[in-house]
């Protein structure tokens, strides 16, 4: 955690300070940025204020006086709530514009961490509380070109595992001993384990026919179906290397069990594929012109394409999400649907592009790639691109 770099950005953005607040390790974003461990007791509130200029300030409870000792700055203590309020007045001083892990109107839920009561308390002291979303994007969500190597390494193994899953399904089809959705899900998890990967206990999505019309369907022993000839198949799988700091890789592919997929299914796949292509081309064009581009703008391109093809009502989620140490990261999402993500896509941003079409009770189609913006401001796809349906027979 580099206080000086944070202060430089605060000055650039015209913000008086960044106030970190936590209780019971609720703010995982703040803990990561500050380099704090979640180990040990965390039963009392603490505050850490980084002003745009000057020395940082720590405010901790006397029951846990060493909670922020790894951080630079002057330390203040409190015990009761009245003293807490007085210390906050003293520490923060005259009314200021202060960033916190807060999102107006809960616009970006990933950032909406500080409780409403604490916001009320600080506003009552005369301060303007603004969102730290742009700061989080810069100091938590961007991935340097050393760390991104773990993403590429995981990607090769995940791609390999997907091919193995398709082959496992093919064996079942040819033998007449059909594999179930759940069996393929468990096969993927076992292969992840064997390869030193983890999905953080979130199982992959494996669904046939109408099952993936629920975009986040995942099979269980109770709801699982056999994967048989003429089935339409969707597999969404994600994993990272099982080591600290590793970055996720997350893809979705579609397949047909047979050699002659229905025309409607082919057409729907081509629509989502081309929406994905259009979104990437727009992003690359903007970056090539050295223009800024926000997550919501890229979503608009993919969404408009699907709407023009007549399936806008069936595209029921954002076009993509930030990726980091968690499969859903804390950076800019490709979203002007579930939220309007105004954050800029910057060098170091890693995210998915995954437009989809979901017809309830019938089928679901999605095509997902991961995109990284490197230090040269080039947007690159980090793995394979699916161009046609995989045919399994």
What is each PLM-predicted segment?
Residues 1-393:
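Active-site neighborhoods and metal-handling regions in enzymes and metal-associated proteins
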């Amino acid at each position: 955690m580099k206080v000086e770099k944070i202060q430089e950005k605060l000055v650039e953005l015209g913000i008086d300070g960044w106030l970190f607040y936590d209780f019971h390790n609720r703010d995982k974003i703040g803990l990561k940025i500050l380099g704090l461990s979640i180990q040990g007791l965390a039963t009392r509130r603490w505050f850490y204020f980084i002003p745009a200029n000057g020395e940082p300030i720590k405010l901790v409870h006397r029951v846990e006086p060493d909670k922020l000792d790894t951080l630079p700055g002057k330390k203040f203590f409190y015990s009761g709530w009245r003293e807490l309020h007085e210390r906050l007045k003293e520490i923060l001083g005259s009314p200021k514009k202060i960033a916190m892990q807060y999102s107006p109107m809960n616009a970006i839920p990933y950032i909406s961490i500080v409780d409403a009561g604490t916001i009320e308390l600080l506003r009552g002291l005369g301060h303007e509380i603004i969102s730290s979303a742009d700061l989080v994007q810069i100091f938590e969500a961007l991935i340097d070109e050393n760390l991104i190597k773990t993403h590429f390494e995981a990607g090769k193994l995940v791609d390999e595992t997907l091919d193995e899953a398709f082959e496992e399904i093919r064996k079942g089809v040819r033998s007449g001993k059909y594999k179930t959705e759940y069996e393929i899900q468990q096969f993927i998890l076992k292969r992840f384990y064997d390869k030193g990967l983890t999905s953080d206990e979130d199982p992959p999505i494996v669904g046939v026919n109408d099952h993936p019309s629920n975009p986040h369907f995942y099979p269980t022993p109770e709801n699982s179906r056999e994967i048989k000839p003429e089935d339409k198949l969707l597999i969404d799988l994600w994993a990272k290397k099982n080591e600290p700091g590793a970055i996720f890789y997350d893809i979705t592919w579609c397949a047909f069990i047979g050699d002659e997929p229905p025309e409607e299914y082919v057409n729907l796949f081509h629509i989502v594929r081309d929406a994905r292509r259009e979104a990437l081309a727009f992003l690359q064009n903007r970056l090539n012109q050295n223009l800024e581009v926000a997550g919501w703008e890229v979503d608009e391109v993919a969404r408009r394409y699907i709407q023009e093809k007549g399936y806008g009502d069936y595209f029921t989620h954002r076009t993509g999400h930030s990726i980091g140490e968690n499969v859903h990261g804390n950076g800019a999402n490709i979203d002007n649907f579930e939220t309007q993500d105004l954050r800029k896509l910057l060098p170091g941003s890693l995210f998915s592009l995954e437009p989809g079409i979901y017809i309830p009770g019938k089928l679901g189609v999605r095509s997902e790639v991961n995109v990284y913006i490197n230090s040269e401001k080039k947007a690159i796809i980090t793995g394979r691109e699916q161009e046609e349906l995989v045919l399994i027979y």
